[in-house]
Amino acid sequence: MEITYDDFKKVQIKVGTVLEVKVNEKARKPSLIVKVDFGKDIGIKQSSAQITHYYTPENLVGKQVIGVCNFPTKNIAGVVSEVLVLGAIEKDGKVVLVHPSQKTDNGLDIA
């Protein structure tokens, strides 16, 4: 399926910095609850992400990530997920997070 450039412009993809991470104990599949600061316009958003193979709460805090910020909220195992943190999904289902190659400002648009 093709989308137009106008369709793509509707997707709010932003840079954010991980502030807090904890294990989502209620999730069926191993997941982390991640709080990300997307800057003054978007603010702090929360996500439940299946990213436990390569990432722990300790090694994620302070890292910058890329997220889709304008999806509707979704309840995942008792957690309100407000943003989709983006990652590359390997053949075995492991997720490698997408991130800026250098430190940048929170809230910047990804195009």
Language-model features: where?
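Phosphate-backbone binding interfaces of nucleic-acid-interacting proteins
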Residues: M1-A111
